[in-house]
Amino acid sequence: MTLQMIQKKYLQFFLKALFFLLASIAFSKFSFADESIIDQDHKLPEDYEAQWERLVSDVEPKLLGGGGSIDPHLEILKQSQFPSAALCGRCHQRIFNEWASSNHAYASISPMFHKFEQAVNALTSGTMGSFCVRCHQQVGTQIGEPRESPLWERSLVAREGITCITCHRVNQSFFKVNGERHVQPGSIYEPVYNTGDAPGVAEVIAERDFYKISTSPEEEGFPIHGGAKVFETIGQSEFCVSCHQVAVNIGIKLEVVWEQYRDSPAFRKGVTCQDCHMGKIPGEAKGYDTGPVAIVNGRVVGDVNRKHSNHAFYGPGYPIAHPGLFPFNVRALKWSVKEWLTFNYREPWGMPDWEDQLEQGIVDRPEFPEIWSTRKVREEARYIIGQNENLLENKRLDRLAVMENGSRIDGPFFDKGSPEVGKDLSFRYRVTNVDEGHNLPSGSLGAQPEIWLNVVLTDPDGERVFESGYVDKYGDMVDLHSIELAEGTIEHDDQLFNLQTKFLTTNLKGTD
């Protein structure tokens, strides 16, 4: 018997309990040692409440740039007016786990973004201002955090990048504004904006004692938003264009994802950004998964067959941040950004077998930073990194799926018939973009994925007799931009197949 066949009202509670059991199993793919980033299966850590309360308390923002006083321009803005994703994740565990390793969650953390942003501001003598951070750190920009503030001086919600409220507290269409949108301030108790009116919220509020929730600071229980208001644009491609079509000046475009999409077969077929980037299959419009919108205090809320939009936001992003800082992990907030950066995760710190050998004197003791001087602390940090590495593996699989579902390689094709011993060989491959929504590759010209073809021909002994697509000692393709080529220590790759888009400059500087 399927869930769809069970109609009788007296079985609804049983179905919810059954789904919760199944959901607990399904969510385990996001876990390390069978425990989720946020414990939704009654395995709450002893300091669970303390962890959450510390995250969402009314802490005044510190004076950015140093000092212990309060910036007068920020004093009126409590952190609770811009709730953290950690608070949303208490009820929306599945969505939180998907978002935690997404490119949206990575937007503020990305070391590559920070280097690129610093370079652009230096090259423009600072005239770019907050142009980049108003997308990557929108809430931080809105509350007045200086552009140049490092991560360890920013508010938690700014470090979360494109966090829950960045989308679900926006209530008007902005269209092409290069990230200049406005997030509605408000505590966790204020309504959120979604494609529907969320009847599940009304159900929970009506049975607040059963779900043990609160809708105001005066009440006890899990704090939740007091409702959901319909904002249809959030489910349309036009919502995405505010950040994914970027012009740095008149006629100079840094990102043209929207224009590619508007000129695509996908657009003509009515396929939206959400259909491919939040659907069931990464990069393909093949419908959506299903599931309840929330699990509140272990109790399933709403229709278990409800459409589920995947908040992993599938894309080709490749994170290189410290795995203690990304993916977003509530337990990791026990330590500061600076402290995490001193944890050498590339070494076996915190791994039980290695820690045993360390105690037995079998391996030499490193000079641990004071914060990581005890085994217990190192093992706790390693546990968190293990959780995050599982999330990163899921992200890797999604990334591969996006690329494989959007492109195809055929060949080799031999131009002179079948190869013969002792004769020259001519062959080729055909690379096809089968993605109906974007060019290949797509994304920001500064940060888009580099796609090139690495072709190697080996002899019967395994020796390379021909190669194209090799890289120099700096990891760069050997085109005219290769530093090693300019140094004269490597040969130019004459047959390089490279889909990377080069920057264009015009007028006085000429073209490239």
Name these PLM-found stretches.
Residues 1-13:
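N-terminal secretory signal peptides that target proteins for export/translocation
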Residues 138-145:
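Conserved, well-structured interaction surfaces
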